[in-house]
Every structure is written in structure tokens, then in C-alpha cells.
């Protein structure tokens, strides 16, 4: 088990929920540290309270997040937990930004759910380079924008839907 790179965010400011497979901790943690180093608040499973029902903590963190950062690998694409988190986020109008850490193909169900969301090809890049590519889109989404099919952004309303502004 790799050491946790930093505490998960627990404040009231906008934050990103990180979706990854535990099997990928060694690959994922440098990316988390690099994005966190860009000043972006991240919640990941380090934020699950001891003794709490983990599924409730995860659902609460997903509902409170402005965006989900999905670190796509063969392990995360095969993970039922990752599928559940992505489906829950999209069902609650939380946008998902996928970053491909390795060459992998999404399952048909993930392709269906994520087909209207832009992704970042991060293969061949180190964690710092990937963080540089995702920090701008994450910052825009944290400021209240949501990606649309046309690539434009709209403000999210408090109810979680898109609204014009």
C-alpha cells in the first residue's frame, strides 16, 4: 500500500472527487499530488472516516463535488466501484473529466455514459505534465462551468443542472 500523498479535502470550497482503482495507487498518487500542487482541492478515499460506512462517505463526497476526475486504467475501467461512482456522479449532474493514465479501452457501459464528456490522453506523459493539462479544465469546472457537447461551458445551478448565465 502506497503512502497517502496528502489529506483529502474536507472544507466548504469547491472540490474535485477523484475516482481511481486501489490497484493503481502507485500510479495515481503522483497525479493526485501534482494536481493538488496546482492548488486544486481533491477528495479521494483517504477522506473516508474510520468507523463510517464507506459507501455513505463516498456518496456524500460525490454529491458535494463540482467535478469527478476519473483516472482511467485497465484496473479502474474493470472496477465495479469506479463504475458505481461515475454512474452516481452523472445521475447527480456532476461532470466527469477522464484522464487516461495508460492505453485502455472503456467498457461499453462507460463509453455510453462518458460519450459526451471530453477526456485527456495522458499516456506517455508524467504526472506533472498530466496535471498541467487537467488543471485548467478542472479550475473552470470548479468555478461553476460544466462541459457541454459543443465544448462550451455553462454555469451549474445549485440544483445541479445546467443553467444559462
Locate each region found by the language model.
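Conserved N-terminal substructure of TIR/SEFIR domains
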Residues: 1-70, 90-94, 104-105, 137-140, ...
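Short amphipathic alpha-helical segments
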Residues: 29-32, 81-84, 110-112
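Conserved TIR/SEFIR loop-to-helix hotspot centered on a Trp-containing motif
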Residues: 74-94, 106-108
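SF2 helicase/translocase ATPase core recognition
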Residues: 100-101
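Glycine-rich, charge-decorated loop segments at or immediately adjacent to ligand/cofactor-binding or catalytic sites
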Residues: 104-117
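C-terminal helix of von Willebrand factor
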Residues: 124-148
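CheY-like receiver
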Residues: 145-164
Amino acid at each position: 500500500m502506497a503512502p497517502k500523498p496528502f489529506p483529502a479535502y474536507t472544507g466548504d470550497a469547491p472540490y474535485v472527487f477523484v475516482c481511481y482503482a486501489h490497484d493503481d495507487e502507485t500510479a495515481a498518487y503522483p497525479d493526485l499530488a501534482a494536481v493538488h500542487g496546482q492548488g486544486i482541492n481533491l477528495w479521494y478515499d483517504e477522506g473516508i472516516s474510520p468507523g463510517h460506512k464507506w459507501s455513505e462517505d463516498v456518496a456524500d463526497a460525490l454529491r458535494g463535488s463540482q467535478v469527478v476526475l476519473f483516472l482511467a486504467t485497465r484496473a479502474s475501467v474493470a472496477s465495479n466501484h469506479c463504475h458505481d461512482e461515475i454512474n452516481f456522479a452523472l445521475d447527480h449532474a456532476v461532470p466527469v473529466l477522464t484522464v487516461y493514465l495508460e492505453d485502455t479501452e472503456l467498457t461499453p457501459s462507460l463509453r455510453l455514459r462518458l460519450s459526451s464528456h471530453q477526456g485527456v490522453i495522458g499516456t506517455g506523459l508524467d504526472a506533472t505534465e498530466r496535471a498541467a493539462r487537467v488543471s485548467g479544465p478542472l479550475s473552470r469546472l470548479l468555478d461553476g462551468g460544466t462541459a457541454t457537447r459543443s465544448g462550451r461551458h455553462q454555469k451549474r445551478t445549485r440544483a445541479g443542472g445546467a443553467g444559462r448565465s
